[in-house]
Design a protein with these regions (language model features):
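N-terminal short beta-loop-beta anion/metal-coordinating cradle
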Residues: 1-47
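General beta-strand structural signal in soluble alpha/beta enzymes
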Residues: 14-19, 36-38, 61-65, 82, ...
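Non-transmembrane, aqueous-exposed alpha-helical and coiled segments at domain scale
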Residues: 20-22, 50-51, 58, 88, ...
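Flexible, glycine/proline-enriched loop segments at strand-loop-helix junctions
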Residues: 36-40, 95-106, 154-158
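Hydrophobic alpha-helical segments and helix pairs
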Residues: 43-83
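Phosphate/pyrophosphate-binding betaalpha-module
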Residues: 67-125
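Active-site rim beta-loop-alpha module in soluble metabolic enzymes
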Residues: 104-156
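A C-terminal functional module that forms or caps the active site or interfaces directly
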Residues: 148, 153-173
Length: 173
């Protein structure tokens, strides 16, 4: 099931894609053309769609909206998290493009724009690193501190999700 909750915000929305069952609608928002599209879950899925959007359709920017599991007691359900980096143990980026670092960073200009827009709209955002993992639910462990506690404490990760590292490393090529 895709989250199509943004469609009502578009004027004159038209279905423009059904390939692989992934729906995309294009319309206008404040007079500017905007496309809203599902991406599936995980780096391989967003990898397919983001690659095609950037390389074949020449999109200007992708803003990923999705869910994350909190590593911080400060983050509550429905809070908005602005990623200042994505940390990952995944080998997806290395296999896909040769990117062999465990952390990627967003566009400063795009984050500045998101921050300014949120401020103008009165939306509170929590900012910090996030953990971009191939595994959303890990098996319980007797290890202390746990893997996620290390990421939270040593790398400052606020939450776990499964797509951001790929989205951010796409900015490099």
């Amino acid at each position: 099931m895709q989250n199509l909750s943004l469609i009502p915000f578009l004027q004159d929305a038209v279905l423009v894609n059904e390939v692989r069952g992934m729906l995309a609608y294009t319309g206008t928002y404040n007079g500017k053309p905007v496309t809203v599209m599902g991406s599936g879950m995980g780096m391989p899925s967003i990898g397919i769609y983001s690659y095609e959007l950037f390389k074949e359709y020449d999109v200007d920017r992708i803003i990923r909206i999705g869910s994350a599991g909190s590593y911080s007691s400060d983050a509550k359900i429905y809070d908005v998290v602005l990623a200042t980096s994505a940390v990952s143990e995944s080998t997806y980026a290395k296999v896909q493009s040769g990117y062999d670092k465990d952390e990627s960073y967003p566009s400063k200009a795009l984050n500045d724009s998101l921050r300014a827009t949120a401020k103008r709209l009165g939306i509170n955002m929590i900012e910090g690193a996030i953990h971009s993992s191939d595994v959303f639910y890990r098996q319980p462990s007797d290890e202390k501190p746990t893997y996620w506690e290390k990421l939270r404490d040593e790398r400052g990760c606020l939450a776990v999700e499964m797509e951001a590292l790929h989205c951010l490393q796409m900015l490099l090529y």
